[in-house]
Amino acid sequence: MAIKITVKNVANGSTIRMEVEPTDRVSDIIDSAAEFWNKDSGAFVLKKGKKLLHGSDTASEINLLTDDVLEMIPDPEGGI
């Protein structure tokens, strides 16, 4: 069952709506959003609230729900 989420690009304030599967990894969400904004996915991380998300976690492991908003921010550790 698809989960409909919003990803917000904190750098410019724009958002996209995405459908993800419970088995999709956070890294997959970053890749899709970065491709949409023509950015290097390795330079960004996602936050859910105040929590930084790990790329290897799945949507179900982070309890992602329909209408959740994730923030895509520059990787505080510098990215690739």
Model segments located where?
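Ubiquitin system architectures
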Residues: M1-I80
